[in-house]
């Protein structure tokens, strides 16, 4: 939906020159006033505070957004805001990248994470750079020491490890 659109039939590129709404199979909606969108490659460059909204609860907003729907990648420059309404958290910053398929991303330059999952308390985290990644929730069983076999580690399907980056030394966390 748009009131003004310039479309090049040779390059399959639509130039967005007014308020525009692009819908992909009822699962992703793009709202923008300025930029371009290629109907063949599903790549777009969105300007002037645009928004990408997914039906799964994810919303990406920024001054300039490069978005590749095919590989599920978004890069934001200027006033980034990534809202995850399913997990009830918002990621803010000046620059960032999001990978939809792997459910991870990062934000830098005035990076802040707000967790609003608890209705009585908000948790704020601020750092130079914040990385976000989704880890599956796992339950563990405590076993008696003598019941663990020597080769039980080798039989594990997937190693249970978490990587921690200690490069960034200044971090603040506070709640409201």
Locate predicted features.
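Mature-chain termini and adjacent capping regions
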Residues: 1-176
């Amino acid at each position: 939906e748009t009131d003004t659109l310039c479309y090049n039939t040779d390059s399959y590129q639509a130039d967005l020159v007014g308020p525009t709404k692009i819908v992909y199979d009822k699962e992703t909606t793009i709202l923008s006033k300025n930029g371009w969108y290629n109907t063949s490659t599903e790549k777009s460059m969105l300007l002037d505070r645009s928004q990408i909204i997914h039906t799964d609860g994810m919303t990406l907003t920024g001054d300039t957004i490069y978005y590749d729907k095919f590989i599920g990648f978004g890069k934001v420059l200027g006033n980034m805001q990534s809202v995850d309404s399913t997990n009830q958290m918002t990621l803010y910053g000046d620059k960032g990248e999001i990978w939809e398929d792997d459910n991870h991303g990062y934000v830098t330059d005035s990076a802040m994470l707000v967790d609003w999952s608890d209705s009585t308390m908000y948790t704020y985290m601020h750092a130079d750079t914040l990385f976000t990644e989704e880890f599956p929730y796992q339950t563990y069983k405590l076993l008696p020491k003598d019941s663990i076999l020597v080769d039980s580690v080798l039989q594990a399907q997937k190693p249970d490890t978490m990587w921690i980056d200690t490069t960034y030394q200044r971090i603040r966390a506070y709640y409201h």
